[in-house]
Design a protein with these regions (language model features):
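Catalytic phosphate-handling regions of large nucleic-acid enzymes and associated NTPases
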Residues: 1-254
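Gly/Lys-enriched N-terminal cap/neck module of very large, oligomeric protein machines
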Residues: 256-258
């Protein structure tokens, strides 16, 4: 930003006197269809890739930044710490408000009961995903550490198993993916709404998913439905089971269940 001089002249001295903004002040007339073609797709891809949808490791960037921060804090083996402490550290990778970061943590916690296999071992009131009346307590009152299952998220992460990139201000680095040892994207449900695209994956039983993956690696013609019967939800429940419908969902990746 321009700074006023200290010599009392009132003139503005700029930090970068040789810098300029290309085409500044020039009004460009073009068809709106051309503008959309040039700008909409890059914007959509940025939202899809960088923010809204889970990657192949099953995590959105906000989840990954939070869990990696907790890993670097030693919360995989150490004792619990205040949630507010984790939220503050996470801002080094995720420059959002503390409320958004804490809400992400709540969803990943055992106390909230959102995930089939929670990633955050929590202590205190984290609310319940199935009740709007049971709100979670403020971050200064709750405590967290990583759940033991996170050992499978970070296994060999310090051995160049995944790529690392600089954070937003180049003060540190963060992983682009987690080297997970099981298909987290199938085990823990994750929803995402992007630009003209959305993702909603049901959670499946961990043992069945691993059994199916091993069988499929050994035999690409393996009948998936013989080992992966259907979704497994954290709150339990009954499903109107239609084998042919499930097969079609497995084949296409599209469909719904009741």
């Amino acid at each position: 930003m321009p700074k006023k001089s200290k010599d009392g002249s009132g003139k503005i001295k700029r930090n970068y006197p040789d810098a300029f903004i290309e085409n500044a002040g020039i009004v460009v007339q073009e068809k709106i269809t051309d503008t959309l073609e040039k700008n909409y797709m890059p914007y959509a891809m940025s939202v899809i890739v960088s923010r809204a949808l889970p990657e192949i490791d099953g995590f959105k960037p906000s989840h990954r930044k939070l869990l990696y921060t907790m890993y670097k804090q030693g919360l995989l083996t150490g004792k619990r710490t205040k949630s507010a402490n984790v939220v503050g550290e996470t801002m080094k990778l995720n420059p959002h408000g503390d409320g958004a970061i804490y809400e992400t943590m709540v969803r990943l916690s055992r106390g909230n009961e959102t995930l089939l296999h929670p990633y955050v071992d929590s202590k205190g009131n984290f609310g319940k995903s199935y009740s709007r009346d049971m709100a979670y307590a403020a971050s200064r009152y709750t405590e967290v550490k990583l759940d033991p299952i996170c050992n499978e998220l970070f296994r060999d992460i310090d051995k160049d198993t995944v790529d690392f990139v600089p954070n937003y201000d180049n003060s540190t680095t963060e992983p682009t993916l987690f080297p997970t040892t099981f298909p987290t994207i199938l085990v823990n449900a994750n929803m995402g709404i992007a630009v003209s695209m959305a993702s909603s994956v049901c959670p499946f039983n961990l043992a069945e998913v691993c059994e199916t993956c091993i069988a499929y690696i050994k035999n690409p013609d393996h009948d998936i439905i013989s080992t992966l019967k259907g979704p497994d939800f954290p709150g339990g429940g009954f499903m109107l089971y239609d084998e042919e419908e499930i097969k079609e969902i497995f084949r296409t990746g599209r469909g719904s269940i009741k």
